[in-house]
Amino acid sequence: MSAPALVALAPGGRDPEAVATITALVAEVRALRPDLRVEVAFLERARPSFDTVVDRLARAGHDEVVVVPLLLTNEGSASGDVLSAVRAAGERHPGLRISASEVLGVSPSFLGVLDERLRDALRVHRVRELDALVLAGEGSGDALANQTVARLARMWGARHHLPVTAAYATTAPPATGEAVRAFRGEGRRHIAVGSLFLAPGALTSRATELALEAGAVAISEPLGAHPEVARGVLARYAVGAVELVPV
């Protein structure tokens, strides 16, 4: 019996750099598990679409599919869109057992990725000293989703023995610029921002712009196509594949 196919499903967007980053991440997943059928798909405004990928898998004879939503927080509307798309695909292909795993989420193992990305940014800007950190995430109207980012921020600060604030690009305060200004108001001058985003995009650009305007000395690139993130995708897939096994 072959393993279920894995579909890594991203929200989508018009930014070609974001699409390229997600595609590269899924290539990392394939490299770690060459025995699996692994596909990338987008919900909207980018190709291949989720429907196209599911139809292709069904035609190829796959009868089980695990969808891993490439979302860092379990934000209500985005997660709802994924579940609606999965249900519709199951109705379109009655012989196909298809389910969605938990969202990729944020794992403590991603702290190493954050460190790596930030070191790269500090090297580019020739920054040798830091006295505060800001962890910038997407933000949500869901307080629990925001608490997940804040929890990771506390872990990141403890790792480096530096004060840290979680900031958000949408909805929830503080914005990255506000967080940087608050630290500067305390007399801190060497403040770096870690980007807790999966790929580039409008929110990432806005968070970066606000942080630089407020005086941040460096802003890291998003997590992107990193083997540790790919392992996170496979961990979600593994749980989803087990749940497909009849009991």
Predicted regions located by residue number:
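Active-site-proximal alpha-helix that buttresses catalytic centers in soluble enzyme cores
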Residues: M1-V247
